[in-house]
């Protein structure tokens, strides 16, 4: 897997997490712990994307 492939894979995962957060937030009784966990995952992925983009 090339560096650009890895970045694209991470971007796809980042979008997927954003969609999961949106779904959870719009539920009648959203689980804040789940939302926090998803946001942490999303931030870690964003940090990795930025780091990889600086090395590309």
Predicted regions and their residues:
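Extended, charge-rich alpha-helical interface modules
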Residues: 1-56
């Amino acid at each position: 897997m090339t560096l650009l492939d890895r970045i694209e894979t991470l971007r796809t995962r980042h979008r997927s997490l954003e969609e999961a957060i949106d779904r959870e937030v719009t539920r009648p009784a959203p689980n804040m712990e789940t939302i926090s966990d998803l946001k942490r995952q999303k931030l870690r992925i964003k940090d990795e994307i930025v780091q990889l983009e600086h090395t590309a």
